[in-house]
């Protein structure tokens, strides 16, 4: 994240699935690097306080941008309870809108981005794992909604908000573009657009490849290590 110079990172369900030993360490590493690790819908069961940061404010070309991040609201159903001991995952509705309103009132951002590790869904309003369309259809005062979890690379445009699915495995990058007309410090008009950009593997960043060569080899060695022998037939078909 530091190498990529990310402005913020939102936690996914797999981060929590790995347990406190992993995501607590990740949060501390991000903190040392000055990168906000966001999951505003995770609260402690002992005192009701938020476990991770909800959002951050960054400046881009003189424009104040609010970035709010959330993990999947249905995490508890996706992993063993020991992985999230002492924590509770809140629904993104109406929480995200409440947070957006609070951020806009306190920080007065000119652009608002919500990053949520939730599937797009069908807008059925009753599926905690798939709240993307529910958010898109209800959020006010948000320019971009970035979704994940279902590996979709869809782009859905509305009059005042655009949903960008981030895809999977680094195969696609969601690119959002916004044009602002600012007068006297106030935005008088804005144009939103977005697209999903495919990554071409024949154009590899060799500098990054060299920078992470040791880490790549360590993971490769671990992944290829022998754990045991299976003597019975296995079926790879999904049920």
Which residues are covered by each model-predicted region?
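Acidic, metal/ion-coordinating pockets
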Residues: 1-201
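Hard-cation-handling environments
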Residues: 187, 201-239
């Amino acid at each position: 994240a530091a190498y990529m110079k990310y402005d913020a990172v939102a936690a996914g369900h797999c981060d929590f699935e790995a347990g406190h030993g992993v995501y607590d360490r990740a949060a501390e590493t991000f903190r040392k690097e000055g990168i906000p690790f966001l999951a505003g819908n995770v609260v402690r069961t002992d005192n009701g306080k938020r476990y991770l940061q909800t959002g951050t404010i960054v400046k881009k070309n003189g424009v104040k941008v609010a970035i709010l991040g959330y993990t999947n609201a249905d995490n508890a159903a996706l992993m063993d309870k020991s992985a999230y001991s002492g924590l509770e995952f809140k629904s993104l509705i109406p929480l995200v809108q409440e947070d957006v309103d609070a951020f806009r009132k306190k920080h007065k951002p000119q652009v608002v981005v919500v990053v949520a590790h939730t599937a797009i869904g069908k807008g059925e309003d009753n599926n905690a794992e798939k709240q993307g369309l529910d958010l898109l259809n209800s959020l006010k005062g948000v320019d971009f909604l970035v979704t994940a979890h279902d590996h979709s690379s869809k782009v859905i445009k509305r009059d005042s908000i655009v949903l960008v699915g981030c895809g999977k495995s680094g195969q696609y990058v969601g690119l959002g573009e916004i044009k602002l007309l600012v007068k006297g410090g106030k935005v008088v008009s804005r144009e939103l657009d977005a697209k999903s950009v495919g990554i071409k593997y024949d154009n590899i960043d060799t500098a990054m490849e060299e920078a992470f060569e040791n880490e790549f080899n360590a993971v490769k060695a671990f992944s290829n290590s022998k754990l045991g022998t299976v003597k019975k037939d296995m079926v790879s078909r999904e049920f």
